[in-house]
């Protein structure tokens, strides 16, 4: 409290006027102090100033990462736009046993069937000689078996020879017979669907010509 005394000079009786004015002191807080001390004031001051955690360096890194992901192409979960050709259609190609060696290459007397063969398969089949089967057994069993196969409607082979034997061979199963086929696939099918005579053995082979 501040006391202001005004003195008026007069001839008769001096008079005193008292004027009271409230001034800020240590006991009376000001408006600015109340605003800073109150929690509401803190919330307002914080809300008025927006904060940002991203810096220019981090934003630059994000832009670079986005460009790298675009250049890298589709991820593992995405389907690529182009697919490899081949293998999508039904039906498998006829597989050959193996590529012909230089000793197996010869001249064939018949054209190779192109159905079910790729370009590589055709070249390998054309390079091979006519596939054959050599039967070994007794003369009677081979003759009877040949007679039945020649009279059947579905023979499944190209040519079949007569029963013959090597000169000087006196073994029990000394008789031989040759069966020629168009392709290795036909030969495999013949072996799969036909029974050979009892105690008869066979082996694969090929000839330059028939």
UniProtKB/Swiss-Prot annotation:
Bias-annotated ranges (Low complexity): 48-61
Gene3D superfamilies: 3.30.70.330
Sequence ranges of Polar residues compositional bias: 24-38
Gene Ontology cellular component terms for the protein in this record: host cell nucleus
UniProt KW keywords: Host nucleus
Record-linked InterPro entries: E2/EBNA1_C_sf, Nucleotide-bd_a/b_plait_sf, Papillomavirus_E2_C
Any GO BP: regulation of DNA replication
Annotated segments matching region Disordered: 1-119
Gene Ontology MF terms: DNA binding; DNA-binding transcription factor activity
Pfam family, one: PPV_E2_C
Compositionally biased spans, kind Basic residues: 62-71
Localisation per UniProt entry: Host nucleus
Principal location listed in the UniProt entry: host cell
Similarity comment: family membership: Belongs to the papillomaviridae E8^E2C protein family.
Function in brief: Plays a role in limiting the replication of viral DNA in keratinocytes. Recruits the host NCoR/SMRT complex to viral replication foci to mediate repression of both viral replication and transcription.
Protein name: Protein E8^E2C
């Amino acid at each position: 409290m501040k006391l202001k005394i005004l003195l008026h000079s007069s001839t008769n009786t001096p008079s005193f006027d008292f004027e009271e004015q409230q001034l800020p002191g240590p006991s009376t807080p000001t408006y600015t102090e109340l605003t800073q001390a109150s929690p509401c004031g803190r919330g307002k001051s914080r809300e008025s100033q927006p904060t940002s955690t991203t810096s220019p360096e981090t934003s630059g890194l994000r832009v670079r990462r986005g460009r790298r992901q675009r250049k890298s192409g589709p991820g593992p979960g995405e389907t690529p736009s182009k697919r490899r050709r081949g293998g999508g259609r039904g039906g498998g190609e006829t597989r050959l046993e193996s590529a012909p060696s230089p000793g197996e290459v010869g001249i064939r007397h018949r054209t190779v069937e192109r159905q079910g063969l790729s370009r590589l398969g055709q070249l390998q089949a054309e390079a091979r000689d006519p596939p054959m089967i050599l039967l070994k057994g007794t003369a009677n069993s081979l003759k009877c078996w040949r007679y039945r196969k020649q009279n059947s409607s579905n023979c499944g082979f190209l040519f079949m020879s007569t029963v013959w034997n090597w000169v000087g061979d006196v073994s029990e199963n000394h008789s031989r017979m040759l069966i020629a086929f168009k392709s290795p696939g036909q030969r495999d099918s013949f072996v799969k669907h036909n029974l050979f005579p009892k105690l008869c053995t066979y082996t694969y082979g090929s000839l330059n010509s028939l």
